[in-house]
Amino acid sequence: LDATLNYRGRENEEHRRNAIENTADDPAQQLAALLRSDYNKKVADIQKLAVWFAFWGEAKSRPTYKKICQERVTDYSQSLTKIIDQLIEEGEYKNIKIPQLVEGIIAMADGLWLNILISDQGFRRQNAEAVMMQYLCHVFPDHQAAFD
């Protein structure tokens, strides 16, 4: 099971890395690409999401799972922090606390994954992506074009 969790983590990290690498050297575009990659059909597949949530549910009682899951969050957080820092500098945004913003984005991303997984109302990957992009439009209003 550890191998499965590691594989899923590497798979997600590869999608994220490719999303950033295949985007222009523009922090708003990179942020949009990074977060959109979370809702790619290869990542936000119902079966794969179910696996993630099963492992997360066991993480507290299984130190190996917790370590692997925490590594995923740390890598994601570092990528977000780097890009958001560049975006804040470029856009001269004030009063944005990067650690809190990153934690909020990660929590939202995980919550949107959960909505995809359990919704009986047809909440889909595209809905999740639209919610995230709408949020980013409000946080970074001078860069809305990247999130449309």
What are the language-model segments listed below?
Residues 1-17, 32, 77:
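An amphipathic alpha-helix adjacent to DNA-recognition modules
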Residues 3, 25, 29, 47-50, ...:
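Short, solvent-exposed positions on alpha-helices
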Residues 5, 31, 69, 73, ...:
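Hydrophobic packing residues in well-ordered alpha-helices of helical domains and bundles
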Residues 17-48, 101-105, 147:
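Hydrophobic alpha-helical connector segments
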Residues 19, 36-43, 50-61, 135, ...:
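Helix-loop "lid/cap" segments that line or gate small-molecule binding pockets
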Residues 33-37, 77-86, 108, 114-148:
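C-terminal peripheral helix-coil segments that are non-catalytic and often amphipathic
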Residues 44-50, 63-89, 130:
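Amphipathic alpha-helical packing segments from all-alpha helical-bundle domains
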Residues 67-72, 89-107:
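All-alpha amphipathic helical-bundle segments outside canonical DNA-binding/catalytic cores
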